[in-house]
Amino acid sequence: MNTKMRAALTVEKRVAIALWKLATPDSYRSVGNQFGVGKSTVGAAVMQVAHAIKDLLISRVVTLGNVQVIVDGFAAMGFPNCGGAIDGTHIPILAPEHQAAEYINRKGYFSIVLQALVNHKGRFTNINVGWPGKVHDARIFRNSGLFQKLQEGTLFPDQKITVGDVEMPICILGDPANAMAHEAVHRQPGQ
């Protein structure tokens, strides 16, 4: 929005500022000097672009895709009937003003958690980001949309393989913190 003092930043300039800030270790002040704006304007541009990416692009880019291709890809690597691999990672952040203690992870630094499900090529098929670093991976998974879809039986089609006399549904590879994925996949909808 234009004001009496200056014209509003164009979308192109906002995106350029955000990309520059996200791609370099430069401070907000340095990026602001580069583009002729204040550091608070840099912060606002980064947040606006990040929200636009989240709202408009994530659902188009981070998708499950063709489940059979994923299952075949994992089978070629020795993991039959696998629909993905899940894990979490900590993204370092500056200490927030409020509830800072909630963001200190087990390694002692401030972070937010990214939980991701990837396909056989390591491409994201589901992400959940933003939980405070102190929160355990199992709790994050239990409260994720991915867990809900697994519980409802809507993430993977009703595809099973038979090993001996046992029918096995599609599974997800993960560490012990994500052991609940096993239960969620194997539970029938409505149980």
Regions found by a protein language model. Name each.
Residues 4-6, 18-19, 101-105:
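Catalytic micro-motifs at enzyme active sites that drive phosphoryl/nucleotidyl and oxygen chemistry
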Residues 27-191:
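Short, well-ordered secondary-structure "scaffold" segments embedded in the functional core
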Residues 1-13:
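Short, Lys/Arg-enriched anionic-surface-contact patches
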Residues 11-24:
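Short, amphipathic alpha-helical "recognition" segments used to contact nucleic acids or chromatin
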